[in-house]
Amino acid sequence: MRVGVVVFPGSNCDRDALHAVERAGAEPVELWHADADLKGSDAVILPGGFSYGDYLRPGAIARFARVMGPLEAFAREGGPVLGVCNGFQVLCEAHLLPGALLQNRGLRFVCRRVRVRVERADTPWTAACAPGEELTLPVAHNEGNYFADPATLARLEEEGRVVLRYLENPNGSANDIAGVCSEGRNVVGLMPHPERASDPLLGSGEGLGILRSVLAGAKV
């Protein structure tokens, strides 16, 4: 399986994501922001960082990058897409996921490990996890405070589209939401960084299950 990792100007987690994809057993494919196609990728990751310097607001400019055209078509056809941190923000700006990521409660950058609970194991990106499984994953963000209007939040809960939930909310996210998925469940956005917890040598391998999920999860 080929897993593409999109590189925007200002991305800084793309190398981590490419390395983690390889460790998960897939073939990593680097996708440049100006690419006109996805190079035959079977799944795509939008990594963390500060795309285009986070000017205007995080993800607002990246949403218009050339590669986003084929990526949006891929997602709407059911292709597995994962947005991590800034990638989650880009997916919200592209309207592939509902809601928005606001500045953290407390107005400070949060950089630490957090405990999250897997709420849904029926997405391509959580198929190797168990419902209710608890993971410790790193977060590193200034705008990770998930927000949606009350009707959207109610719909996400009713439709089972909250994928990860914080056990100790680090940023003020509504309903302790750490990740959500699209109606088709193929597009997932997470604020925690599974790729930074993919090698026990670096402190944790707990995020590797999320990246390995797509190998089996592509069939979900």
Curated annotation (Swiss-Prot):
GO biological process: 'de novo' IMP biosynthetic process
Pathway assigned in UniProt: Purine metabolism; IMP biosynthesis via de novo pathway; 5-amino-1-(5-phospho-D-ribosyl)imidazole from N(2)-formyl-N(1)-(5-phospho-D-ribosyl)glycinamide: step 1/2
Keyword flag ATP-binding: yes
Reactions it catalyzes: N(2)-formyl-N(1)-(5-phospho-beta-D-ribosyl)glycinamide + L-glutamine + ATP + H2O = 2-formamido-N(1)-(5-O-phospho-beta-D-ribosyl)acetamidine + L-glutamate + ADP + phosphate + H(+); L-glutamine + H2O = L-glutamate + NH4(+)
Active-site residues from the entry: C85, H193, E195
Record key words, sorted: ATP-binding, Cytoplasm, Glutamine amidotransferase, Hydrolase, Ligase, Nucleotide-binding, Purine biosynthesis
Gene Ontology terms: cellular component: cytoplasm
EC code: 6.3.5.3, 3.5.1.2
Gene Ontology molecular function: any one: glutaminase activity
Subcellular location: Cytoplasm
Residue ranges annotated for the Glutamine amidotransferase type-1 domain, each copy included: 2-220
Assembly and interaction partners: Part of the FGAM synthase complex composed of 1 PurL, 1 PurQ and 2 PurS subunits.
Stated role: Part of the phosphoribosylformylglycinamidine synthase complex involved in the purines biosynthetic pathway. Catalyzes the ATP-dependent conversion of formylglycinamide ribonucleotide (FGAR) and glutamine to yield formylglycinamidine ribonucleotide (FGAM) and glutamate. The FGAM synthase complex is composed of three subunits. PurQ produces an ammonia molecule by converting glutamine to glutamate. PurL transfers the ammonia molecule to FGAR to form FGAM in an ATP-dependent manner.
UniProt protein name: Phosphoribosylformylglycinamidine synthase subunit PurQ
Upper classification of the organism: Bacteria, Bacillati, Actinomycetota, Rubrobacteria, Rubrobacterales
Gene giving rise to this polypeptide: purQ
